[in-house]
A protein has these predicted regions:
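Hydrophobic beta-strand anchors of alpha/beta hydrolase catalytic cores
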Residues: 57-58, 90, 113
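N-terminal targeting signals for export/organelle localization
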Residues: 1-35
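Structural microenvironment flanking redox-active thiols in thiol-disulfide oxidoreductases
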Residues: 95-102
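A short glycine-leucine-enriched loop at secondary-structure breakpoints
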Residues: 104-108
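Short active-site neighborhood of thiol/selenol oxidoreductases, capturing the structured segment around
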Residues: 52-65
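Non-catalytic, surface beta->alpha helical segment in thiol-disulfide oxidoreductase systems
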Residues: 74-76, 109-141
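A short beta-strand-turn-helix
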Residues: 38-55, 85
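Typically the conserved alpha-helix immediately C-terminal to a functionally engaged Cys/Sec
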Residues: 67-84
Length: 141
């Protein structure tokens, strides 16, 4: 190898390393596991709420929602959020496959979070991306 090729080889190795590690980080974020024990049926969540006395945390989401996808690898994978969520019956509502509750609660933005009574009465609402520390603060109000 000639000395004039060394800088090209070194730069090439650096570019390849950065591209590889960047791809790994994105893959990990996309495949992070949610640790919230989501229910997927609002009526069942209401029944559980009546039995336990815990209010319902309703999370309205969609597969095409970028902030919702980011929350999978951040907020919903965070242990402090999981701990704060133990005071609630968490239910995840896909707006595309569950249009009835989406319409009933007039959900217009993704993601939307509602705190509901056991009868389904809305008590609090918030919309948009929430990182773990913001979610915990909101849940503890």
């Amino acid at each position: 190898m000639t000395s004039s090729m060394r800088p090209v080889l070194v730069i090439g190795m650096i570019v390849l390393s950065v591209a590889t590690f960047s791809g790994v980080s994105e893959w990990r974020a996309a495949h992070a596991k949610e640790i919230i024990p989501w229910r997927d049926d609002l009526a069942a969540a209401q029944a559980e709420s009546r039995q336990t006395g815990r209010p319902i945390f309703a999370y309205f989401t969609a597969s095409w929602c970028p902030p919702c996808q980011k929350m999978k690898s951040t907020t919903w994978a965070d242990n402090t959020v999981k701990e704060a969520m133990q005071k609630f019956v968490p239910v995840k509502i896909d707006v595309d496959s569950q249009p009835e509750p989406t319409a009933r609660y007039q959900v217009r933005a993704m993601p939307t979070y509602l705190i509901l009574s056991d009868s389904g009465q809305e008590q609090r609402r918030r919309e948009g991306l929430m990182l773990p520390e913001d979610m915990v603060r909101w849940l503890e109000k």
